Design a protein with these regions (language model features):
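Active-site beta-strand/loop microenvironment that shapes enzyme catalytic pockets
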Residues: 109-140
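Conformational gate/switch positions in structured elements
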Residues: 29, 85, 129-132
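Acidic loop->beta-strand submotif enriched in PP2C/PPM serine/threonine phosphatases
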Residues: 1-35
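Residue-level signal for the start and early helices of compact helical domains
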Residues: 6-8, 116, 127, 158
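C-terminal catalytic subdomain
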Residues: 19, 31-116, 142-146, 150-156, ...
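Residue-level marker of motif borders
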Residues: 23, 79, 124-125
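Short beta-strand segments
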Residues: 25-27, 128, 219-221
Length: 263
């Protein structure tokens, strides 16, 4: 069907879709890419389709797919685009929850309740913090095996491994880096080229929260670690709480559904 909007003829199509279907729209700056540079006649639509299909993996986010095409356009323009180039991508996917646990509860007697609620949730499980991971290990009657490999970023403490948990990491240092990545993601100074390929704990959390998850449940303990207090914050307000609040705001701007539960 067609209709007129602001003097423009808009063509509309309605059709069934399946999971992992991808829709890509682009301005003519994409098809002009390379004119006067690498390609005499620009980057033809058929060639863009071939490029998108050749570089597609089922786990690729819509942002990654669109960014990959834009990067190739910039390469064909040799860094000097002759036209504005916009690419939009939509990927059809099921909702995928991720649950993140950080910090022991303010009242130690609430630990079992906190763990029961956390481990009853559907989806992947991330546990952050040494004390928190030990509480989780006691609840599951499992042991934590800490990796001796710092991954690709030696500034981030090593991850751990525990049966029943998808990812075990250190707390404040790791989460601070995740917030840094989230801020860059939202504000346009994107660091995806770092966290999307690195193997440290912060990068793995970023991959799960930014790319994999659609719904994120935070389970946050309000016990205060004196080593992490900031003199600019009230004594009852831990740094981890501020980190989670800031991260939640960035994740919501990414379109994620966020729920935060405090204990």
């Amino acid at each position: 069907t067609t209709r007129q909007i602001a003097g423009k003829t808009i063509h509309e199509s309605r059709f069934p879709v399946e999971e992992n279907d991808v829709f890509i729209a682009m301005s003519d700056g994409a098809t002009y890419a390379g004119v006067g540079h690498a390609l005499n006649h620009g980057w033809q639509r058929e060639n863009i389709i071939d490029f998108a299909e050749a570089n597609y993996l089922p786990g690729n986010s819509a942002k990654y797919i669109a960014g990959n095409i834009v990067d190739e356009c910039n390469r064909l323009y040799e860094g000097e685009p002759g036209d504005d180039t916009t690419v939009a991508a939509v990927r059809i996917r099921e909702r995928t929850p991720v649950n993140l646990l950080m910090g022991p509860p303010a009242d130690p007697r609430d630990a079992t309740k906190m763990m029961t609620l956390f481990f009853s949730k559907e989806g992947k499980k991330i546990v952050c913090g040494g004390t928190t991971s030990q509480i989780a290990a006691d609840y599951l009657h499992e042991t934590i095996v800490t990796s001796l490999d710092y991954g690709t970023d030696p500034a981030i403490p090593p991850v751990g491994h525990m049966k029943g948990v998808d990812l075990v990491t250190e707390g404040v240092i790791t989460m601070s880096r995740v917030v840094e990545y989230a801020k860059a993601f939202v504000e346009g100074t994107d660091l995806t080229n770092l966290w999307s390929v690195q193997t440290d704990g912060a990068s793995q959390i970023a991959q799960l929260l930014f790319e994999y998850a659609t719904d994120i449940n935070f389970f946050i303990g309000k016990a205060i670690n004196p080593a992490h207090q900031n003199p600019d914050l009230p004594i009852t307000f831990g740094i981890k709480i501020r980190l989670v609040q800031e991260l939640s705001e960035y994740l919501e701007k990414m379109g994620k559904q966020i729920k935060v539960s405090y204990f």
